[in-house]
Amino acid sequence: MPNTKSAEKHQRKSQRKRIFNLRAKKELKEQIKQLKDLIEAKKKQEALAFFPKIQSLLDRLVKRKKLVANNANRKKRRLLEKIEKITGDGIS
């Protein structure tokens, strides 16, 4: 239990941030899983169309400082490499 009103407020704020962070992380994981499923099914066009959505989400999380920039860049690059592997051409 917080001892002061400001400590109570800080606790409420941190709980709201925690919920947002969990939702964002869950959404990211779900979208990456969807893309990986498309790649495994070798659906090239759908995977290429879906990739910008994940890219946008990663960039938003970096902008809000919920994800480290290098981590997001690494995720984007690895997903793009998997897409390139099924399409057979360099997208970069």
Swiss-Prot record:
Q: Which GO terms describe its molecular function?
A: rRNA binding; structural constituent of ribosome
Q: Which UniProt keywords apply?
A: Ribonucleoprotein, Ribosomal protein, RNA-binding, rRNA-binding
Q: Which Pfam families match?
A: Ribosomal_S20p (PF01649)
The cellular component terms of Gene Ontology attached to this UniProt record, alphabetical and capped at eight, are: ribonucleoprotein complex; ribosome
Its GO biological process terms?
A: translation
According to its UniProt entry, this protein's organism is Methylacidiphilum infernorum (isolate V4) (Methylokorus infernorum (strain V4))
InterPro entries named among the record's database cross-references: Ribosomal_bS20, Ribosomal_bS20_sf
- Signal peptide, first to last residue: none
Family from the record: Belongs to the bacterial ribosomal protein bS20 family.
What protein does this entry describe? Small ribosomal subunit protein bS20
The encoding gene is rpsT
NCBIfam families membership: S20
Q: What does this protein do?
A: Binds directly to 16S ribosomal RNA.
